[in-house]
Amino acid sequence: MYTRNVQKKTINFDSFAVKAKRDNTKYLDDSPASQIVKELEPTERDLVVDKSYASAFFGTPLISYLIKLGVDTLIVVGGSSSGCVRATAVDAVTRNFNVAVVEDCTYDRIELSHKAALLDLWMKYCDVVKSDEVSEYFASLKQSSH
């Protein structure tokens, strides 16, 4: 499942852009900045959730999709660690999901913000793991399903 930041032409939901008096049209639906990079491009079977706020849960149908699919655990990656990743992880925990944030698959504009966000998430909300731990987890799921 993927999320992407998409803004509407008529409304600027990004309060930071408003505060900084920035034009936020780079995140319109058809702009390159709102697209998922080719190397990680979703397949036809993948769900893509468009969001306008930091949390992937706020104002989106994400919770409905997860419940319908019987999901109990979320593995969160992406950016920014102190913004979208943190907001999504915290919201997922408040909805009773098990959550892991993948340390080496998340990023932030400033390394200090990245480290502080991961520390805060680990101390209060969820597991912070490395990508090799996630690979081992998926391998164990495959083995147990055979």
Regions picked out by a protein language model, each given a short descriptive name:
Residues 1-10:
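Von Willebrand factor
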Residues 7-8, 17-146:
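Active-site-adjacent betaalpha module
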